[in-house]
Amino acid sequence: CRTNFDENTHKYQRISAIMVERGPGVETEYRYGLMGTRGGGTGRLVFRNVRVPMKNLIGELHSGALVFHQMMIPERLTSAAASLGVRAALDIATRYSDKRHAFGKPIRNFEAVSFLVADAVTQLDAARALVYMAARAVDQNAPNSRRLVSQAKKFATDMAWQVANKAMQIMGGIGYTDVYPIEKIVRDIRLSQIWTGTNEIMNLLIQHEYYKEVLQGSQDLRNVERDAREQDGEAEKCYIDEDMWRVHEG
């Protein structure tokens, strides 16, 4: 909530994080029906003349932005790690493809099916490796942990959506029914690409952090740019339009 109304104050120092308990003035005006993850309720809350005691302040006064940014690291990493649970859908589809027969043989013998399994398990293992890498970076307070967590959240949740759909594709029409839990997994996993920051926002954070690492980081690695045969041809390294015209005009 807004606690500092001084317009000259930095925007990150204008809000505070508080815990609002259920009581007079706190109402749920609308409950949303959800495509998936129906175990958690989602609704529109309305606060009318609600008083919050100072003891319900989370962190320091006016430090709500700091609390939010600190909270996003574990939230996004949790989203990434939870996405690895899509392994269950792949396992169900893999077992099904071994039992289901078509044209006299298990459908796993058709590359159109088995290659979906190969792609899916590769994506799953790659995502798992990135999630563990990001978790290790957070534990070690590594300077690139914010980027790695954003990458893990984006990559793992995209992977989960793709793998869940591959599992349904392997199983065909029966995967679309509630005889198997694949349809539920597909509905549930879709939210992971949206909550705790959409994957488009993750791209924004990733590129920002990586540019900062490359452009502001120390040049302690070998400068591979100097490996070019014409490494000293500075006149040919056109960075702006004027450089291009100057080179071509001789």
Question: Which ranges hold each PLM region?
Answer:
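A short core secondary-structure module
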Residues: C1-T28
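Short, solvent-exposed loop/turn segments at the edges of secondary structure
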Residues: Q13, G40-T42, R187
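Glycine-rich beta->alpha junctions and the first turn(s) of the following alpha-helix
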Residues: A17, V26-D125, S150, S192, ...
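C-terminal helix-coil-helix/basic helical segment that borders enzyme active sites and/or dimer interfaces
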Residues: T94-K105, V121-F155, M168-M171
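Residue-level signature of the cytosolic catalytic core of signaling kinases
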Residues: K11, E60-L61, N109, N141, ...
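Alpha-helix capping/hinge segments and adjacent helical runs
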Residues: T37, P143, R147-R246
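Generic, well-ordered alpha-helical scaffold segments in large soluble proteins
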Residues: M71, A89-Y96, M133, A137, ...
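Short, cationic motifs built from Arg/Lys/His that form the positively charged side of catalytic pockets
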Residues: C1-N4, R76, Y96, R100-A102, ...
